[in-house]
Structures are given as C-alpha cells and as structure tokens.
Amino acid sequence: ERLVVLPLYPQYAAATTATVCDEVYRVLMGMRWQPSLQIIPHYESEPLYISALSNSLNLKIKELNWKPDLVVASYHGIPQKYFDKGDPYHCYCHKTTRLLTENFKDTEIKTTFQSRFGPEAWLKPYTDKTLEELPKQGKKNILVICPGFSSDCVETLEEISIQGKES
C-alpha cells in the first residue's frame, strides 16, 4: 500500500536521482492500483547520513598506521553544462563535505569530482588531476573517500582503488 523510494545517491542530480524517479513513475503508469508514494529526493545534509559518513571515516583513519595529510572527498562528476543549467548537485556535494569537515576540525577535507569522459568540461577540480598535484604540494599521505554513493559502486571502486593509486 505504500512505496518509499530512496535513491542511493545522497546528493540530488537530474542525471541520477531524477532518472530513478522517472523510472518509478513509468512503472506506476502501468498499474491500475496505485500505492501511496514517497520519494526521498536527496539527503546530503541529513544528520544520520553525516553521522554515518563521519563514523566510517573515523574508523578508517584509526585503522591506518599513518595520519592523512589530506582527505579527498571524491564525488562522481557531471558535465559542467548541467550545473550551468541549474542542477544543484555541485552545491550538495560541497555541502556534504562542509558538514563532514565540521566533525574533523584537525583534518583537511577537499571536494573533487571523478569519472569524466568525452570532450566536454565536467565539474572541477578533477580527482585524478588533484591526486597528481598533491604530492608536489607536500601532501603524500592522502585518504580518498567517496560520499556520493550510499553503497559501493564498482566503477568508483575501480577508478579510485586502481587508477587513483596510479596517480
């Protein structure tokens, strides 16, 4: 009788969250019986989400046998033109990082964007370029987190775990 849709993208973007909603509506259009529908559009700043991120990051830092010079919060990128047209994703990513930073006053956290492809401009700064530049700035102990997904994303795991180390 009730359908709650929670897209696994904490930060709303038309290309992701709205696409999930479009598919839900498409399926519902073919149904005679309609459930009560609630869609959680974004939760980038929800206290429970920020707390879960903070706890996860804190545990990871404690597991390390080194102190990070910097934590890179790498979000999946979107084309710059989406932001220029008013997509709030970029703002939501920075909001998540800002709220996370409030729980780690002694740790610098930087927002970056990954997974760009094609010739057009994407949101910056780019994760791969940032990871290449940080050692030149004396930051060699870098921890990368990916708060743009609520569960592991194979593309992101490959990109950050393998390609990120190569940078």
Describe the residue ranges of each PLM region:
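Extended amphipathic ligand-handling, pore-lining, and cofactor/metal-binding catalytic surfaces
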Residues: E1-S167
